[in-house]
Amino acid sequence: NDKKFIDQIDYFLHKLTKEIEKAGFKLNKNKTNLNFKDSRQLVTGLVVNKKINVDRRYYKETRAMAHRLYKTGEFQIDDKNGTLNQLEGRFSFINQVQRYNNVIDSSKHDFNNLNAFEKQYQAFLFYKYFYANNKPHIVTEGKTDINYIKAALKKHHLEFPNLIVKKEDGEFDFRVAFLKRTNRLAYFLNIKKDGADTMKNICKY
């Protein structure tokens, strides 16, 4: 943090090397850089300064992948067709970094105050849950409704073979999915954990 250390660089490196070797390690000079705390430091896709940020190129690539997915139904990662889970992993990684920064700044962060990236993530989540899902999604009003519906379907599975099938091992295979209300969906899509306004909020998109 002391920018005057550059005037004593040789002494500093000697002391640093001595401490590292004392701990049983060896300093690799080819992979060692000295930076000020506000210098741009790139580590595995992260720009590590006083405030952590995602490398701009990583963000742009993720946004481009999502755009191609929405337009064509597919996208590539390293010249191979990517999966929805892979793309969600990239969005989730960026979001984790931004959530950390949101905690330390003084701005308001909620559904009505999404930044540019969060709006991109919002669009992806809507695409995943309400467009690209491979099963019809049932949206319930209360969080316990899912348990009651599942229990009823199991009891009457022979009457609703398009919704549920009992397998040979006795387990049930649901042909429908249930939307689980999470903090993430509440933040990005305004889908609260309880409430009757869920369908109204979904239809806004």
Positions of the model-derived regions?
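Short, flexible/disordered intra-domain loops and linkers
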Residues: 2-10, 188-193
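Acidic, divalent-metal-binding catalytic cores of TOPRIM
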Residues: 111-205
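Right-hand nucleic-acid polymerase module
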Residues: 4-121
